[in-house]
């Protein structure tokens, strides 16, 4: 789907660029269809696929008690890559850009200061991001007492948010490179917000306003 969207976008741009030229309809169509030389390989949908696929494999093959250690390893390892590879600079010397150009080719990257926001290396912390979500989901399924569930979820959210902002003094919160602190803070805020929704809807019973959002909640990838 992601590659299809990227191709369609390139098709439209090529079609529009040929609108003023005196060529036949079939020639214009052919040149617009065969635009794979500059198609962007990675994107949001592709990242979702990579992260969900990696998380599924890890969840099926690794003992779940070791997943938190893997999350820490992925985030720390990625931070070391950023520090040693000029990863916080928006230029061609950035390790993220270097790897993407070497593997994907510059013609197949998102053109934004040499950095592809959905590049290969930045998928590492994104996988850790999804793994944190897996751990939170596992907690929600295993803990039956709703009060204990809320306490643990609020605690996790608070700790992650505080830790992320604290670490941001040495590792800036940056979505474009998907910095470790960005993953930690967003997971913390998301966990806290989820706990708040559970408290409002399941504990207090204010459910009528949430009916509209149920379809989005149970079908997020389809939407």
Residue positions per predicted region:
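Alpha-helical transmembrane segments and their immediate juxtamembrane cytosolic regions
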Residues: 1-223
